[in-house]
């Protein structure tokens, strides 16, 4: 049993979290105009994407329309710097083409003044993170009795994460009174998640110095695919009187309709001498988990938006509260044997190594925006919104591991213009995003490698900054627009 206690400490070190996956609720705004206006659709009708933001505002639409929205592309840069010249500086850049959106809101024939229907298909999450690094150096890692002189150290790290979530929404709105409208939206979410993380390091002896140990190495490799179908409901209210608009939206927690996935994990330790042991041993752990039933949760949320119209200006502000989600198990490995060869004793450690868990903290995101009408066919738009991360850390850290997350708050600055035609409207804009965390733990390191840390190096803390620029474009076609 002592052998497994030693391995628990070693293997949990290999599964230390690296943060790179999405954990923001509002990185992608639905609809180009709403993205530029930073959530103004909470309080008043902006475009046919109202079915997603606040279905009740569809009753204020003056025309029926179909919107085709897409970002032309986004460039993200992430850099870590501990400020001490130690460890590894992480520099990664990625150019992405984001999926588009199609949405429509339509009057229900002769009941147009009482009811409206909205539909939409859009990308709710689109996040790809790729990173690879390698280090080769001459370093004295192993004691000189077994490996005289310095060893050749080779370390490699690879991370590849892809998260895509596509949502289909259908909503209905009705007028309750002169000033009040109500709406409801049903959303079906299809979420696909791919994750691969590999770390391997080797300390190779100089054969000319007659070592008693030729090589010491460690490697961890974990890969998983997780798929979900979720259902989420929204209820909304809209109030309009004179130049003022108010919107309230309550979103229920997501309900799982289907989930599936698989995971393959492997750890190899070669000629490792664990702490408090005088003997070297090699260890091997491997498991393939299939037909998994993973879990994924979205919390309850409450949104409130307000806007006021002036002669040629509309000012909007809004906020959304997201509830917390207590720690839950995303992937339960069951009784699969991980440590090899399998025994009755080592099965109890599988859950500690391979269990994936998540926990979301409560937060509030806010936004402000302005739209300035230059003339009946042209307007300028700009806005600012916060996009706080929802990762929550539990002390002491439970065994198992979290999927990687971007643990920095983001702030989005938007600007653009709207050009209206007789039966259409074009919107062009740009979004600049900035995120930063000043007490961020370096996710991996090749410096300070030793047997006590399984050749992984010592991870320091420093500042991480993420900057991105995204182009935004959309086309709106009016089905029946009143003559101006």
Language model features with spans:
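Short, Lys/Arg-enriched, disordered terminal segments
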Residues: 1-5, 483-484
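Sec-dependent N-terminal signal peptides
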Residues: 4-14
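Single-residue recognition of alpha-helix boundary sites
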Residues: 13-14, 65, 189, 253
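Outer-membrane beta-barrel porins/channels
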Residues: 21-30, 34-35, 105-484
